[in-house]
């Protein structure tokens, strides 16, 4: 479908200087028709989808990398990190730096819990092997 092709194009090119007209051209439809399809299907414009996709990717990079906010903004298709920060704060409710700080701790807790679960599984696995001998 046009929407799935458009979304795939966005996923592959979100870091580029991407415009809605580029997406429409890729899927071979008129820009206004692309807007109608997105509004009908996703209840948002293609531009809003692109912005939300970029910010979502930014959240991921803030959490799993040590890259600076400036580098992450550029990796998400923003030429100006201040514009990225402004949009990020508007959508997420906090600055990228604050998001990183708060969510890094959350990730650390999840990793610790996963390691504990793995340790328990390994103990269970060792017991299972001992019982089989």
Q: Which ranges hold each PLM region?
A:
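An amphipathic alpha-helical interaction segment
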Residues: 1-8, 33
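Terminal helix-turn-helix DNA-binding modules in bacterial transcription factors
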Residues: 8, 12, 17, 21, ...
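Short coil turns linking two alpha-helices in DNA-binding domains
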Residues: 30-31, 79-80
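Short hydrophobic/aromatic patch on the recognition helix
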Residues: 33-34, 38, 83-84, 88
